[in-house]
Amino acid sequence: MFCLTTLVFEQKLHLALPIVYFLVLVVGVTSSRMILRAILTDHHRKQMTPVIIYGAGQSGRQLLEAIKQVNEYSAIAFVDDNPKIQRTVIYDLAVYNPNEIPMLISRYGVRKILLAIPSSTPEERKDIIRRLEAYKCEVLTIPGMKDLVDGKISVSSLKKISVVDLLGRAPVAPRPELMSADISDKVVMVTGAGGSIGSELCRQILNCRPTKLLLFELSEFALYSIDKELRETQAAQGSQVEVVPLLGSVQNKERLSSVMKAYHVDTVYHAAAYKHVPMVEFNTIEGIQNNVFGTLCCAQAAVDAGVSTFVLISTDKAVRPTNTMGASKRMAELCLQALAAEPEQKTRFCMVRFGNVLGSSGSVVPVFEKQIAEGGPITLTHQDITRYFMTIPEAAQLVIQAGAMGKGGDVFVLDMGESVKIIDLARQMIVLSGLKVKDEQHPHGDIEIKITGLRPGEKLYEELLIGDEVQKTTHPRIMTASEVMLPWTQLSDILSELQTACLQSDQNSLRQLLLRAPTGFVPKDGICDLVWQQNNKAV
């Protein structure tokens, strides 16, 4: 019996061994793979940048799903201002109060905070961004809802905080009736079409469906660039607007007249100008010839060609100018005011003043971004300098709307919001790049801010208005200013003398004439023209 039992058991054991071996093999292989995967996953996770997602709404959840598809970021938590979802778990990620961000940074070594709040107001974004400045983390954001391609969020759509976010200014929707009044079904001409403002005017004008859009530009490359861009836009949108690229100088009245008459121009936006204060200060005669007499040539050509509306793009630097550029733009305004007051004037002249536009050539923002990327220092001319800022699209839209409101000789002033202290802007840009300001209190910081001294003709503060007679219009961001003016009979004498002084390179007479005209010119520096200085060295 014992032998029989043993025999049966051994037979069963022999039959079970393959099964046992198979199970051991499966468990061994599976567990080894799981261990290896865990090791590799942990290794990959350590290589990824730990991030916090600010905003646990639909956009934040989409961003989390997008992050999981790439090996760049490792999301460790949501934070959200909504107390109803704090202390909950969404997609295996806990939602924290924003006050707990310091703890999360310390515990998980968070290096970046990703903003996923596209529907927030500009004021709300500004408040959140200012709170995040306290942490040494780079802040990135997804675009606003209107800028998202197909409404989809991806890691590639993340971008750095822009100065627009720092300004926290809510846009005012453009009024269609004002946008189209001088453009729709009309022939429109933009001088300086390849510049920062000129090119944006062209983009906005194209959307308002003129019959023709004339791009008038001195720079061949700038003209080529904007013409190419607009044609690509037209192809994508199926637009039938005729775009006409024209090379020419605004100082050539014959060229201007022939263009305006040949195309029967209805509306002119005059954006061509020399605008950089030091450059005009160093090249006084060219600045006056272009800004004053170039404007006059355009305006007179418009009158001769029967143009209905002429809008001058002016500047806040024309108010109590301390430099030649500002004085030259104020002289340009005086020219239009005088022409507008002429008897039986059929062309409606107006001018629109505003401050600095974000992203324009020479703007502090791209300069600061480049300096931060290069490790500093950020160079600033004065620690107390302030400026007004506006986005280029908003400025262009307001210029078009203001032009439609003009009755003749109007000086419009755009509401630029609050002035910005440039040193504060520089500090914010450094901190939001995940770096620290290097100064006496923080000698081991990353980026130093270096004060270089005011440039020739540069103001500490800019003004937008002259006098107190400021009147509101029907648009909340457009006002009118009451200005001193001269009738054409008096102004033409000054202009004649000014032209003679330019032709004779008489810098002293130029300055005296700018002082004699009602420009409010109070020069901050002596004569800075480089050729004049070189000649005086030789003497």
Segments predicted by a language model, with ranges:
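N-terminal Rossmann NAD(P)H-binding glycine-rich loop of SDR-like oxidoreductase domains
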Residues: V188-Q204
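Conserved Rossmann-fold cofactor-binding substructure of NAD(P)-dependent oxidoreductases
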Residues: L247-D266
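Aromatic-rich membrane-interfacial microdomains
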Residues: M1-I52, A56
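A solvent-exposed beta-alpha-beta segment
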Residues: L36-D150, L218-S225, E232-A235, S239-V244, ...
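Strand-loop microenvironment adjacent to phosphate/nucleotide-handling motifs in alpha/beta enzyme folds
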Residues: A173, L178-D182, A338-V539
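Conserved Rossmann-fold NAD(P)-dependent oxidoreductase catalytic core, especially the SDR/UDP-sugar
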Residues: D150, H270, Y274-L334, A338
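Flexible, Lys/Arg-rich cytosolic regulatory linkers and terminal tails that connect or flank
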Residues: L93, P98-N99, R125-V187, A193, ...
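NAD(P)-cofactor binding segment of oxidoreductase domains
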Residues: K126-L140, K212-S219, A262, F282-T309
